[in-house]
Amino acid sequence: TVDPDGVKAYVTLQENNALAIVDIASATLVDVVGLGFKDHSLAGNYMDSSDRDPNGAPVANIISRPVFGMYQPDSIASFTVDGQTYLITANEGDARTWGPFNEESRVSSLDLDNTVFPTEAALKNNASLGRLNVTNKLGDTEIDGDFDALYAFGARSFSIWNTSGVQVYDSGDDIEQTVLAQDPTHFNYSHDDNSTLESRSDNKGPEPEAATVAKIGSKTYA
């Protein structure tokens, strides 16, 4: 997206969880800003992390999980309020895969640090975090072969940032909570014909992909 005066462009670097700021006139890169992580253990940031809960049955279960979400936005748009430009992102998430390289693993396949995750066996159950896809390239902070933190793809939300890449708002778990309340039959549903309830819960959930902004009268809508 481009700011209103046409000076700078803002480009999402989705798989790298970052934002590039480009000077248009000189066609040069001004900055690359990391977007950070979302703590799904905090109230308001909860998630449904399994397509088989409880006991293998598909039931919506939006709760606190010891997982960080990588925002990894796909679409980005900009808008102005009181002379200040803001960016809005749809935090879809996407894994890096090419050739034999694949950073995607289910939590059940990873060795977790027992100090950080004392209930490892329970967490790796399919009804808990076992089915959740996370990156296998981030989280071994002690570099000892086990994972001290878990990072899932996408943040299941939309965010608003200032033009320096500082987050000023995130929708938290509103998308999952709203879909569950308004259309529970299609909660975390896939778009294919054979989808089932919460079939996407283990893989980016509602997966927001597009962001569009429009002004109607004096109000701005996204």
Model-predicted regions and their roles:
Residues 1-222:
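Beta-sheet-rich non-transmembrane sensory/scaffold domains
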